[in-house]
């Protein structure tokens, strides 16, 4: 394949993802150790990522790798996107269809609840333990997840699980980088909850994936534009190309 110009992303150009098996194992460990005494907050993009997270939770529940789950999806957009996914279930692969049907048939293993109103969302904050709360936005810059963080970050019994990239300057990035205190609604909030990053679900290719794709070109492009990445990650990809 010959290209005059190539545009390539570099989001994870300087790192490798964990395997899917390792991702499932870490998620299961966080859920098993946290839920008896606290809640697990999962900031997630409403379209695509939330549905993937629900798939993983159902897979762990069906395999008996986690205790019975009560999962709240607290995002109107995520609710709508999940309903669309369910509406077109016949075109999904068999594994996904079977898993969705299993979850509906076994609410005692995974109870799935979608919030309808702001009042429903606020009621979740009264739960002290046993809740998995999946809410937008994925980088914690807006949305209902900020309210859940305000109520759960100060509690060492709770955990926050990130499944996607956190850009510099976002609340999510501050938490991933180990901030001891953040500001929410103009007030300081101490961070005592544990914070976990599970990279195996990312939609962005890691360094190995990017370089493997580049190897598919029989002739090098005349020009390559490295985009969509922080300076360090873009530089690593650029150096490999050179």
Give each language-model segment a name.
Residues 59-62, 101-242:
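C-terminal regulatory/interaction regions
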Residues 15-18, 51-52, 81-83, 142-144, ...:
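Short helix/loop capping segments that flank catalytic or ligand/cofactor-binding pockets
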Residues 49, 70-87:
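Short, conserved secondary-structure transition motifs
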Residues 84-92, 210-213:
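Short, surface-exposed amphipathic charged segments that create phosphate/polyanion-binding patches used
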């Amino acid at each position: 394949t010959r290209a005059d110009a190539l545009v390539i992303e570099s989001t994870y150009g300087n790192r490798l993802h964990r395997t899917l098996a390792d991702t499932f194992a870490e998620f299961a460990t966080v859920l098993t150790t946290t839920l008896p005494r606290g809640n697990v907050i999962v900031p997630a993009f409403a379209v695509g990522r939330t549905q993937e997270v629900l798939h993983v939770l159902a897979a762990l529940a069906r395999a008996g790798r986690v205790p019975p789950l009560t999962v709240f999806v607290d995002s109107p957009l995520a609710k709508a996107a999940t309903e669309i996914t369910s509406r077109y279930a016949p075109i999904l692969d068999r594994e996904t269809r079977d898993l969705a049907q299993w979850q509906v048939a076994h609410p005692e293993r995974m109870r799935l609840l979608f919030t309808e109103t702001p009042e429903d969302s606020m009621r979740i904050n009264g739960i002290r333990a046993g809740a998995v709360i999946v809410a937008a936005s994925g980088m914690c810059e807006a949305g209902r997840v900020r309210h859940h963080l305000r109520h759960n970050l100060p509690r060492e019994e709770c955990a926050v699980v990130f499944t996607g990239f956190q850009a510099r300057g976002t609340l999510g990035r501050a938490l991933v980088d180990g901030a001891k205190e953040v500001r929410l609604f103009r007030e300081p909030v101490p961070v005592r909850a544990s914070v976990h990053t599970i990279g195996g679900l990312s939609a962005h290719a890691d360094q190995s994936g990017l370089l493997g794709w580049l190897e598919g070109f029989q002739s090098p492009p005349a020009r390559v534009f490295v985009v969509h990445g922080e300076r360090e990650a873009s530089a690593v990809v650029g150096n490999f190309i050179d």
